């Protein structure tokens, strides 16, 4: 168990490289399985654009910290590993914060303090402790990319649902927040829609997250039943 409250996820001894990514993306999803990083998940996702920006920033931090901590795993003594990991995470987050302030200033103003708070994100520290200290650099990078992609997907879906219900748009202000190249993402889903106020308020985030959690449970159960049925058919054929 991580000191940050993140569950120490057991990993198989051997995996095909892409399995490190896919298992982190779905099986150990940061928000839907480990229930970590709920503060930005609920607070930032008023629009899909905000969710995408926060997700990409977190993904960058996860990939870089996983790579750095994994490369130092044989040189960090157990007595000081937590301060060292927090220092590495803080350094990477500071660089990410400065980069977003320089090149995505409008998005930086919207996300504000939540970028700096990635330092305290239990998903980052917990994964560094439970995975990166035990695995080589390449699997750690793939794991970080999978964790970040899964987290980004959840933020975008929650933000997209709330934005559509709240204002009838999708990825609004993407060109101003992310850059002019993202103008094509801006969609008016429901023209002249007055919106549902609850959707853009904090309770709306909890409600949408609850539906996503339920949907994942249903999908996982159906997949398990399908695998069990297939296994039973193979046994009969043998």
From Swiss-Prot:
Pfam families documented for this protein: Rnf-Nqr
Keywords associated with the record: Cell inner membrane, Cell membrane, Electron transport, Membrane, Translocase, Transmembrane, Transmembrane helix, Transport
Enzyme class: translocase
Subcellular location: Cell inner membrane
Origin: domain of life: Bacteria
GO biological process assignments: electron transport chain
GO CC terms, sorted: plasma membrane
UniProt EC number: 7.-.-.-
Membrane-protein topology: Multi-pass membrane protein
Transmembrane segments: 24-44, 52-72, 84-104, 106-126, 141-161, 195-215
Family from the record: Belongs to the NqrDE/RnfAE family.
Role according to the record: Part of a membrane-bound complex that couples electron transfer with translocation of ions across the membrane.
Subunit structure, as described in the record: The complex is composed of six subunits: RnfA, RnfB, RnfC, RnfD, RnfE and RnfG.
Protein name per UniProt: Ion-translocating oxidoreductase complex subunit E
Species per Swiss-Prot/TrEMBL record: Azotobacter vinelandii (strain DJ / ATCC BAA-1303)
Lineage of origin: Bacteria, Pseudomonadati, Pseudomonadota, Gammaproteobacteria, Pseudomonadales
